[in-house]
From Swiss-Prot:
Annotated tissue distribution: Detected in testis. Detected at the acrosome of round spermatids (at protein level).
Gene3D superfamilies to which the protein is assigned, alphabetical: 3.30.420.40, Actin, Chain A, domain 4
One CC-aspect GO term: acrosomal vesicle
Name used for this protein in its record: Actin-like protein 7A
InterPro entries xref list: Actin, ACTL7A_N, ATPase_NBD
GO process terms (BP): acrosome assembly; fertilization; single fertilization; spermatid development
Source species: Rattus norvegicus (Rat)
Amino acid sequence: MSLDAVWAPQTANIGDGPAKKASDQTSMQTQVLQTASLRDGPAKRAVWVRRDNAEKEEPVKSAVSKDRPRLEVTKAVVVDLGTGFCKCGFAGLPKPTHKISTTVGKPYMETAKTGDNRKETFVGRELFNPDIHLKLVNPLRHGIIVDWDTVQDIWEYLFRQEMKIAPEEHAVLVSDPPLSPHTNREKYAEMLFETFNTPAMHIAYQSRLSMYSYGRTSGLVVEVGHGVSYVVPIYEGYPLPSITGRLDYAGSDLTNYLMNLMNNCGKHFSEDHLSIVEDIKTKCCFVALDPIEEKKIPPSEHEIHYTLPDGKEIRLGQERFLCSEMFFKPSLIKSMQLGLHTQTVSCLNKCDIALKRDLMGNILLCGGSTMLRGFPNRLQKELSSMCPNDTPQVNVLPERDTAVWTGGSILASLQGFQPLWVHRLEYEEHGPFFLYRRCF
């Protein structure tokens, strides 16, 4: 199957953001945000490196591995579990076919463990059941799984209710965040092989998959999701964990900060209204190219109306762009961590000269929070200001909010990747440590 015939990434211009007028007055108007064509081969060299290593392995002394079944590429399922959403679909497609909230509902009245078969976890559309009062629970904290039982419930719902498939008939590729505990991979294997009885599985780093969606083999992945942000240098397919940057603020912190700003202006939002605030953030907010100049614009030019679910209208003003300043000045949300642009430059400065030059032109933006209007433009401006003697280049894809899943779809569809599946019989014979021979 040729992925070139299915889809190809598009190029965005630096002036597409909401601060276009301001950007036209700067020298930045000559810069463009670039992407690579998938025709260049989606991370071919990185995949071939792993394929060569896999072929050089000592043959496992097992009759099973000699005659392990060949998997149909179209049957592979790709799952990207994020703090905000869980995305899944069949490998080979350009975007996930199913996307549900990772937040689940638990009844306030806990069910007894003595034969009570009442439902304990409500997922996806089940959350809208008006007859049951639910407390909302998220099984992830800053991108790391803290409740595996709930993750199992989410996947059960995805496989059985959303995709309507039998997981025992499909190989599954799972994404794993940077700097996650090694035990994560063993828990994924245990759940997929022992609970869902999948025939084969593979685990890949999220940042590497994001890079594959750009058709690159090297790059600096700047990922801003819902619960955590990362800056990950990758060279020839290999992430560099020693200089990877992690920031514990992301989209959920932006939502809370926006709520505080609106309440300071006389609104009355609480945690029960976070879904409404999320919608306001998505539809009304943007990132200012120059917040100081933006503040000089008459407030009436920023003012827009938003209709609440009950039909009432509220007016929004400067909080539309002030909320996003937390990414560049985390002290606004009482965080002592570096700003996103500062962390990006810090990671670049830790690289040797040749690698830094390569990564400087391959800054790859990913994650749902980067979809805010003006985000790429502002990051480009901040990086150019901090690196006047270099030429940093921010690259964007139109659907970078699903970049991790798309990269997994590409990877699982490559013919050269097929020997890297870990099969259930291999897992049963050699144990969880066999994962590290194929997933690295």
